[in-house]
Amino acid sequence: LSPKPGFAGLPDIPAPLRGTYAGAAMMAPYLGALGLTVIELLPVHETDSDQVGAHAGSTNHWGYQTLAFFAPNRDYSSDKSLGGPTREFKEMVAAFHAAGLKVYLDVVYNHSAEGGNWADSPDAAGFTSLGGFATADYYGLDAAGGLIDGATGTSNQMNYSSPLSCALVLDSLEYWHGVMGVDGFRFDLAPVLGRR
């Protein structure tokens, strides 16, 4: 339900709502009538993917560079007001539930939008996501203190030897389930979460 090529002509969705949580909610009755029981959304955590590409000038709209694990991506919200993306996301989930669909999220906890090979220097650890707060607790570091890419191939690797990182994931999952109403999760590169 993205405004990207291939989805631009969805019927019955007003142009300003295409690619938004509100637009997706409008599709709920149709998807339920098809007999679907679950909808899985690609990552919806706040991200900086459109600003930080692998190469200068490139963009990435997939959402796999998480910036904030507790915030719905405001780019997918028609309501940009304070709290608007959260309200709109919850309304979308309610619409899917009313149509008999469960909502699963594709979640990315193996890495974040922090530095690494996406930055100007692969040794960079900045203040994009969690770096600078407790970098060694959140990220795997090499002997020189630089971020390691490890098994993710995507910029850095979260440090799940750290209780702080483990708590972040559990708290985030509890939030998305208990507060936002999400029913299940698909974990990107799930084996990385078990590495110590």
Question: Positions of the model-derived regions?
Answer:
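Substrate-binding/active-site clefts of carbohydrate-active enzymes
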Residues: S2-G181, L189-R196
